[in-house]
Structures are given as C-alpha cells and as structure tokens.
C-alpha cells in the first residue's frame, strides 16, 4: 500500500511537469531553420513570433535570420509611430545588442545578439499590441 501511495505521489509530481514540457516544445515539426523561419513569419503577432523564437531557437548563428523575422514583425507595429526620444532609445538598445558580444567568438553569441535585438523590438512594440477583446471587432 505504501508503494502505491509513493507511486501516486511521484506521478502527481511528474504529470504536470510533462504537460508543461510539452507546451515548451517548438510547434514546428521539422526544426529546419528554413521551416522555423517560415513558421515564425506566419505567426499572427509580434508576441507570438517571439514566443515561437524562444521555443524553436537553435542556439547558433542560424538564429540570426529567425530573429530578424521576429524583429521585423515587431518593428512593423511601431514603424512611423515613435517619438524622436523613443527612436533614439530603440537605436541605443539595438547598439547594445550589436556590441555586447561583438568580441566573443562562437555561433552561440550570434544567437544571443539575435535574441537581444528581437527582445528589444518586442519591448518597444508592446504598447502597440492590440487588446485581445478588440480583435474580433
């Protein structure tokens, strides 16, 4: 009886973890960089694109093109809408991303740069996200 209770306790801990892990998987079956890039370009929003990038990144220089798609999708939300001060701040954030790992060798650092740029664009785009309630109107 004790072993049954112990087994159930272990299952109670593992089952939610398995469900969370499944949710964190890349939704793109193939995992080829071209397919990931295409899938992210078809994401409905900047936010969805960034989340997909986080789940599907490869951790190498292959993330440069994938991150560029996310960055472009997010930049489209605020293009022509930023004040001079906001443009300057975004430019500074991009500069930080471009220089932070510039002296580091290795493709993972190019991935870090791509993530940094995508996250900077996402942060600037956030005030321009459409509220969920108004999407159907």
Which residue stretches match the model-derived regions?
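Generic marker of residues within folded, mature protein domains
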Residues: 11-13, 64
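Mitochondrial intermembrane space
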Residues: 22-137
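N-terminal signal peptide c-region/cleavage motif recognized by signal peptidases
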Residues: 14-18
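Sec-dependent signal peptide recognition
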Residues: 2-9
């Amino acid at each position: 009886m004790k072993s049954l209770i112990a087994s159930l306790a272990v299952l109670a801990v593992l089952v939610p973890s398995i469900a969370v892990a499944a949710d964190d998987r890349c939704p793109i079956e193939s995992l080829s960089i071209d397919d990931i890039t295409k899938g992210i370009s078809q994401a409905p929003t900047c936010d969805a694109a960034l989340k997909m990038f986080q789940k599907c990144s490869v951790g190498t220089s292959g993330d440069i093109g994938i991150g560029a798609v996310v960055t472009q999708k997010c930049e489209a939300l605020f293009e022509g809408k930023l004040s001079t001060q906001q443009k300057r701040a975004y430019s500074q954030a991009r500069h930080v991303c471009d220089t932070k790992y510039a002296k580091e060798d290795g493709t993972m650092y190019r991935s870090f740069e791509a993530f940094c740029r995508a996250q900077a664009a996402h942060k600037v785009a956030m005030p321009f996200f459409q509220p969920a309630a108004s999407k159907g109107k």
